[in-house]
Each structure stands twice: as structure tokens, then as C-alpha cells.
Amino acid sequence: SEAYRLRDMVMKDPSLVGKKEDIKVLADANVDVWLAGNIDRSLPDEQQQLSPEVRQLADEMKASGVMENTFNTNIFVSPDSRSSPATSGLAGAFMGSLFMMLIVIIISIPIGVASAIYLEEFAPKNWITDVIEVNINNLAAVPSIVFGLLGAAIFIGWMHLPLSAPLVGGLVLSLMTLPTVIITTRASLKAVPPSIRQAALGLGASRVQTVFHHVLPLALPGILTGAIIGVAQALGETAPLLLIGMSAFVASVPATPFDQSSALPVQIFLWQGNELRNFFEGRTAAAIIVLLAMMIGLNSIAIWLRKKFEVRW
């Protein structure tokens, strides 16, 4: 808060005691909404959040230049706050999303790619593999909220993992992303011409050598693209995270995946439904921009990797 900031200034430089010092402080959320024009000024006093004196003072300070609109950079370094909405930030939600994406990458991509290689190149064609393929395709079409229910039952109810932790969110999103990674990887492997396999086998290469030395490098651009798009899709999911407790208010920045946290999509949902949503409009827009920037970044990486490793024949 501003009081703590003032205390820290004095403790850092005791010579400030007895001096006049100009400092900038954040206005109250209701004052911000009033000056932004998001409140009907024609409403009677009993329906206004601010007293007539405070409203008049705010207008006078705005007109005289004492109060001004500036970009609050603390939104990127501060966690959410209920006691002081003006200091609310995205740091906690951003770190929560970052931890979850790392878990998704570590779990879903290796397992998904390995499963796809086995099913496409090595698994015998029988009724068991047919059932597995049908189930994978069905899982890819399951609504994401079902994975949230599954995660709440298994990871929280049965395994007793911490509620609202990025670890649980990452595991749930990994389950949701796995079918997408498997399907895109198999499609990339199928796109490699059969003549590549036949030529390698004809020159004496084993089945394993053919797959890992010749087929997989050619399929790599499609595999990487599908994996990153799956991660980007998981980044924007909200419904499964609500069911594992990530909608709870958390006023701290997580240091590990085991700490309680929120996520960017959930934070957007909470701010938009807040009773002070008029005040949180700017913060909601900033959170959306950050989320879109992350997704655009992931998709740009996917396009770059595809262009870099693409092989034409």
C-alpha cells in the first residue's frame, strides 16, 4: 500500500523527515470509475458510491491537473487484491499460467509423440489398437469441462494434491492436450511418403532406424506445429480450471507449481464478473492483451519451426 511505500522511503532515507516531498498515489477504485465516466452522474446521491464532497473534490483535482491518468505498470508485477483494487495486478495469474504451460509441455508432448509413433509405426493392427484409436478421437471431442471434473476427482479427491495449484491445472490440461498431440503427430507421420520407408528398409535399415532416422525428421515440422498449437489451446482454457479451485482468490505470486494460484483466463473471468467491473475494465483488457500476446507468440513459434524444418520432396 501507499503507507508502506512511504514508510520504506523514510527508512531508506531518514533525511526526508521534516521535509516536503511530492509523491504519486493511486486513486480509489470508485474515484477512478467516476472520473472515467463509467457512472451515470445524473443518479441521485443515495445511489452514488461517493459522497457529493468527494465527487466535487475529484473533479476539481482532475481539472487542476493534480490528478492525472497514467499507465499503472504495477499491473504486471502485483498480484490480485481485494483490500486495494487499485493495486490489483496480473503477476500471480501470469506465473500460474506459465507453470501450467511448462507442465503441459513436459508431460503431454513427450507422452503424446511417443504414443503416436508407437500406434502409427509399431503397433499391430488388431481390435485393441482400433479401440485405442477410437477412444483417442473421442477424447479429442470431449468438452474441456469434463477434464476438469476428472481432475477434481482424481488429482484432488483421490491423490490429495493441493487445491488451486498450477500442478493440478497443468495435469488436467495435459490430459486435455494429449489427444490433440497424438492425432497431429500421427497425421504428420502419415504424410511422409511410403517410398522413404521402403528405400530405408531396402538399404538394410531396421524398422527402428527407419522410423527415427528417416521418417521422424521429415515429420518433425508437423509434430512441432501440432504440439505448440495444443499448448496454445490449453493456455486459453477456463472451464476445467474453475472446477479445480483456481477461481479462488489468491493474493500472492506462486513461487512453485505447488503454491496456490490463478490463471490468466480465470483472472479475466473473475474481473469481468467483479462488482467493480467498471473499474476492472482496463485491467481486464490488459489481461486479454497479455493472453493474446502469449498465444500469438506460441503460434508464431509454431510457424517459424515449421518453416525452419520443413522439407519438400
PLM features: what roles do these ranges have?
Residues 232-278:
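Glycine-rich helix-loop "coupling/hinge" segments at transmembrane-helix boundaries
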Residues 184, 193, 207-245:
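Transmembrane alpha-helices
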Residues 104-136, 149, 157, 303-311:
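Transmembrane-helix boundary motif in ABC transporter permease subunits
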Residues 80, 84, 137-173:
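Generic hydrophobic transmembrane alpha-helix motif, especially the helices
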Residues 135-142, 154-155, 170-181, 231-235, ...:
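Hydrophobic transmembrane alpha-helices
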Residues 186, 190, 194, 201, ...:
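C-terminal transmembrane helix and the adjacent membrane-cytosol boundary/short C-terminal tail
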Residues 1-86:
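Membrane-topology segments of multi-pass transport proteins
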